[in-house]
Regions:
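Extracytosolic ligand-binding ectodomains
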Residues: 2-10, 19-410
Length: 410
């Protein structure tokens, strides 16, 4: 039988062994209840290439963080919900994630309309929201001063008031077109984007020769294209979702009328590239991320995505990269706050002390109390569709990516 001294020594040895094991394996050191994070987007339907890519990027980041020990010693768990790109579904999901699932924050929102309809519930509950794909200019301005004392809506995507001037600068100034036509879908995203395009054109002293609207699931753009052609348009500026944008390119081919397409970032989606096929070649759009391994972080991210999801080409590289980065930003704030309390997370986001090395960029105090946009105008570059994939449109953009474009510190 062991005496008291032998028992104490054995117990101490076991304790040391456990501690060493925990130190050598951070994942096993996690304790306490999981930290629930809402994850919402369209995982089915016409916007799903964006939603699924965003979701996959988020899940990759969560896996990386949990492997390294989690946050505050607790694992992260994503509570996924498919909003189907429908405003009313997004509203229901917001209330469920807040009241039933008790999430500490929510990541996602692909569609501007869904974001605008849903995020007021998070604002009222004082739960931070990260719009990691939706780009409508008004999204982060919905609850600003003096109407609201605090704002719980953040974004790490290039807003439309960044993209629209870029599109106009590319088409009018850099390429020298003089008679633009605007084709925008009928959603909040398309119509708010159209307004931003019109403002950017007006700043150049230019007015669209034709402004046309189309609906989600439209498959024939002949009428809109004929009116643009008859008006003498020499370039088409687009704001819409991928499947319908492909019908613009296909309609041009049917009419034998090939003028360039310059539009918002959604021209990079697989639903545009695959549906338009060769007709989509040459389409140009702003991008925060192009699937190129030109930094160590991007190389690791691309390889991890390809291995995890068994695909060579991401359906929406921008969505995947921004989804990944949104998790890194949120967890940096939780770590700094030392808490999962919504107010403390918001305060930490507005004054992040730690640089966050993301896939899109390195974030160095990206937010303040009055600026909830992580992406500044110097970060996006232009991509162009070439042989079924997006590549940099300009050589200087390739160089810019290698240098990594960073938002000036607030």
């Amino acid at each position: 039988m062991l005496n008291r001294r032998q028992v104490l020594l054995a117990t101490a040895a076991v304790t040391v062994g456990v501690l060493v094991g925990l130190m050598s394996n951070p994942a096993s050191a996690q304790s306490g209840a999981p930290i629930k994070i809402g994850l919402t987007g369209p995982f089915t339907g016409g916007s799903s290439s964006m939603g699924v890519s965003m979701r996959d990027g988020v899940k990759l980041a969560i896996a990386d963080i949990n492997k390294a020990g989690g946050v505050l010693g607790r694992p992260l768990v994503a509570v996924e919900r498919d909003d189907e790109a429908r405003n009313e579904v997004g509203v229901q999901i917001a209330q469920e994630l807040i009241n039933k699932e008790r999430v500490v924050a929510t990541l996602g929102f692909i569609n501007t309309g869904v974001a605008l309809a849903s995020q007021r519930f998070y604002q009222e509950a004082e739960i931070p929201v990260f719009n990691n794909v939706a780009t409508g200019t008004v999204i982060t301005q919905q609850f600003t001063a003096p109407k609201e004392k605090t704002n719980y809506i953040f974004r790490n995507a290039a807003s439309d008031n960044i993209q629209a001037p870029m599109i106009v600068e590319e088409a009018i100034t850099r390429r020298g077109f003089k008679k633009p036509a605007i084709l925008a879908d009928s959603t909040n995203y398309g119509q708010l984007g159209r307004e931003d395009l019109e403002k950017a054109l007006a700043a150049k002293g230019v007015k669209a020769v034709a402004t046309e609207k189309f609906n989600i699931k439209d498959t024939d753009m002949t009428a809109q294209l004929l009116r643009a052609k008859e008006a003498g348009a020499d370039v088409i500026l687009t704001y819409g979702i991928g499947p319908e944008l492909a019908q613009i390119a296909n309609g041009q081919a049917k009419l034998g009328w090939k003028v360039p397409l310059v539009g918002s970032w959604t021209l990079s989606m697989s639903s545009f590239i695959d549906t338009a096929a060769a007709n989509g070649d040459g389409a140009v759009m702003p991008q925060t991320f192009i699937q190129m391994p030109n930094t160590a972080k991007r190389k690791a991210f691309i390889e991890a995505y390809q291995a995890a999801y068994k695909t060579e080409r991401m359906p929406s590289p921008v969505s995947a990269a921004q989804g990944y980065d949104s998790v890194l930003l949120l967890t940096a704030a939780i770590k700094q706050a030392g808490s999962t309390d919504g107010r403390k997370i918001r305060e930490a986001l507005e004054n992040l002390q730690e640089k966050v090395e993301g896939v899109v960029t390195t974030y160095d105090r990206p937010f303040t109390a009055s600026d909830h946009e992580a992406i500044s105008a110097n970060i996006p570059v232009f991509g162009v569709v070439k042989d079924g994939k997006v590549v940099p449109a300009h050589e200087d953009d390739v160089a810019g990516d290698k240098a990594l474009r960073i938002k000036p510190r607030a």
